[in-house]
Structures are given as C-alpha cells and as structure tokens.
Regions:
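Glycine-rich phosphate-binding loop and adjoining helix at the ATP-binding site
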Residues: 71, 75-174
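Glycine-rich phosphate-binding loop of actin/hexokinase-like ATP-binding domains
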Residues: 171-228
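N-terminal helix-turn-helix
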Residues: 1-22
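A mobile "lid/hinge" subdomain adjacent to the ATP/sugar-phosphate binding pocket shared
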Residues: 225-268
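Gly/Thr-rich phosphate-binding beta-strand-loop-beta motif of the actin/hexokinase/Hsp70
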Residues: 33-69, 177-190, 231
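Conserved phosphate-binding catalytic cores of ATP/NTP-utilizing and phosphoryl-transfer enzymes
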Residues: 22-46, 150, 154-175
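Hydrophobic "anchor" residues
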Residues: 67, 124, 194-195
Length: 268
C-alpha cells in the first residue's frame, strides 16, 4: 500500500502536469470539506482505429474517454488493398487537421484489426476480404507518417477487454467472447488474462469449416463459419430473400434492430 505522503506527492505531480484538476468540494461531515479531483480531459488524447472492413472507424478521444471526433469509411467489398490503406490514412489526416489544436497532446494510435497479425511487429499479415492485403507493416506506416506511438492488436481481442472492463464483475475472470462482425472471431479470458497467442491470433475461428459442401466463403473454401453467420454472409442472404439490390451494409446490431421492429426477413 502507498503511504499518504506518497499519494499526495503523486497527486501534486499530476496537478502540475495538468492531468488532474480541482473538481469542487464534497459536503463536509465535520471539519474542512474534502476537495474533489477530476481527470482533465484536455490533458491528453488518443486515436483509435477499428479496422473491420468493409467498415473502418476512426475516433479521437480525450483523457476522460470522451469521443471528440470521428470518421467512418464504408468500402465496396472489391476495393483493392492500396486504396483501402490510402483512404484510411487520408481520413486520419483530415481528422488530425480538424483537431490540430490538440495535436501536441495526442499520445498515440491504437488499431484493432481483423485478419491475422504479427503483434510483436505491428504487422497485418492477411485479411481475406481485402484483395492484395498481405504483410502490411501497419505500425511502421502509421508511425512514420504521423510520428506517434502505434499499437496493433486483433479487433475481437480488444472488444473482449472492453466487455470485461465495462460490463462484467471483477470476479468474472474466465470467459469466452464471440465477436460477430463482418467476420467472426473469439477471445478467451482465463484468470483475468487474455489468452491471445504468441502473435495475437488465438481464437481465429471464422474460417473453421463446418460443411465442406457448404456455401462459398471469401477465403476460397466452402462452408466456413463466416460463410454462414458473418455479417457479409447475412447481408448477402438478406438481399437474396428481399430481392433487393440495395448496397446498404447492415451490421449485426442493425439486423437485431430490424428484427425488433418487425422485419420478417431479419427475424428468420
């Protein structure tokens, strides 16, 4: 345990650096009213990139975890790798230009990405859904362009950490998280530790073959889990059942909303 003088020293250093600020006073129960301290949201910022494909979401958040700016890119499914990367960099650049006043206080970029990765190198090895996306040195590219620290990890693994932090009790230390997105992935938490594998690819279940004679998957195999239950498969099936040529892309959350609102096809 930290001693009272040590805690006060840490708090004072945070005040000097502008990380915490006075937040008023609590009602006294006797003696001097206790002073409240708050995180100064403007003290630091971070960029998050949710690289799911065909959707990429970019957000700028402050130290209080409040999103102050965002971008969303929806690609056509046949978009080439070079265009995907170039447009993502361009949108990130535009976001930084819009919030140029806080640029000196941005501490880093975090990327949650689909597909297989080499986490220790910040490299995206392969994304089946993007033509030509092979061994993209995402960490190096972002660091060289924006001169910020960059962290790359599997998107579903990061979502599992969010689920744990926001919605689960502290004693829920063991669980399996299934992420149904444009593809399907999973994450395993054991004794509060994410079992993500040596390079961050544990739980890569979307291309597990369920039926060798099943529907064609984007990976070239038949009957993968993704080909049955991933968002791309659900969108394709929805268009078939509704005889629709609508190019709108529905997420799993969208399908659930449609179902609750009485959409018969979504309910199937």
């Amino acid at each position: 345990l930290l001693s009272r003088p040590t805690i006060l020293e840490i708090i004072n250093s945070f005040k000097e650096e502008g990380i915490v600020v006075n937040g008023g006073f609590r009602e006294s129960t006797g003696g001097r009213p206790p002073q409240l301290l708050c995180i100064n949201g403007d003290s630091a910022y971070a960029i998050g990139i949710d690289f799911e494909f065909p959707t990429i979401r970019i957000a700028l958040a402050n130290a209080k975890r409040e999103i102050v700016g965002r971008r969303k890119i929806l690609f056509k499914i046949d978009t080439q790798a070079e265009e995907v990367l170039a447009r993502m960099l361009r949108e990130l650049e535009h976001l930084l230009e819009e919030f140029s006043s806080v640029r000196p206080r941005i501490v880093g970029i975090g990327v949650g990405i689909c597909g297989t990765i080499r986490k220790t190198e910040g490299r995206s090895l392969h994304i089946t859904r993007i033509r030509g996306w092979e061994h993209v040195e995402l960490q190096r590219i972002l660091q060289e362009k924006f001169h910020l620290p960059v962290y790359v990890n599997n998107d579903v693994h990061l979502l599992a950490l969010v689920e744990k932090k926001k919605y689960m009790r502290e004693d829920n230390s063991d669980f399996v998280y299934i992420g149904i997105r444009s593809g399907i992935g999973s994450a395993y938490m054991y004794q509060n530790k994410l079992m993500d594998g040596v390079q961050g690819n544990a739980g890569y279940i979307g291309h597990t073959v369920l039926n060798a004679e099943g529907p064609m998957c984007v990976c070239g195999n038949r009957g993968c889990l993704d080909a049955y239950a991933g968002e791309l498969a659900l969108n394709r099936r929805y268009q078939e059942l509704t005889n629709s040529e609508n190019e709108s892309y529905y997420t799993m959350r969208d399908f659930m909303k449609l179902s609750r609102n009485g959409d018969a096809v979504s309910q199937k």
